């Protein structure tokens, strides 16, 4: 159920890496998706003036360093730093290093963790088209009533037109 009278907010949205997993589950073609939603790939989130003015922090999507059975990476890094062998801790984050150099690539091994920056209204339209291609029927209207079973589950929804839609799964995407 969707109403043409209720618009969507067309703003840029930042996602997190789990979005990528959702798209894999839905078998969404990444190139098509990025084109349709005017999206870009992001390797982390940048926080400007994080602690002090002019001091930025990038929260990279991914892991820093490689741990092993003996200990976590941070232990090796701290020991190396104490001996003068280690670079900055952030230098061991592939996502952060790629972000700082404005680089990205789909690698066969050591896949970079990433997310997207997208136009929310274009994404809603894209998902609608995908769903309709899979047989989902879009019903124009406004929900004015929600009827529940004795256990509290949704039994059906009533539209402004009087149409009653029953179902087993209802998802509110407002």
Say what each PLM segment does.
Residues 159-169:
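Core beta-strand elements of the Rossmann-like FAD/NAD(P) dinucleotide-binding domain
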Residues 1-5:
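Conserved acidic E/D residue at the C-terminus of a beta-strand in Rossmann-like folds
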């Amino acid at each position: 159920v969707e109403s043409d009278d209720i618009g969507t907010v067309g703003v840029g949205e930042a996602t997190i890496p789990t979005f990528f997993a959702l798209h894999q589950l839905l078998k969404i073609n990444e190139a098509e998706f990025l084109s349709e939603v005017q999206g870009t790939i992001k390797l982390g989130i940048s926080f400007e003036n994080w602690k002090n003015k002019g001091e930025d922090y990038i929260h990279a999507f991914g892991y820093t360093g490689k741990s092993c059975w003996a200990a976590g990476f941070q232990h090796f890094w701290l020991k190396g730093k104490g001996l003068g062998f280690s670079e900055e801790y952030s230098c061991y984050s592939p996502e952060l290093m790629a972000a700082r150099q404005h680089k990205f690539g789909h690698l066969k091994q050591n896949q970079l963790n990433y997310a997207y920056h997208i136009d929310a209204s274009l994404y809603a339209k894209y998902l609608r088209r995908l769903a309709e291609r899979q047989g989902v029927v879009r019903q124009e209207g406004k929900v004015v009533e929600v009827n529940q079973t004795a256990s509290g589950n949704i039994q059906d929804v009533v539209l402004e037109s009087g149409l009653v839609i029953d179902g087993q799964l209802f998802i509110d995407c407002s």
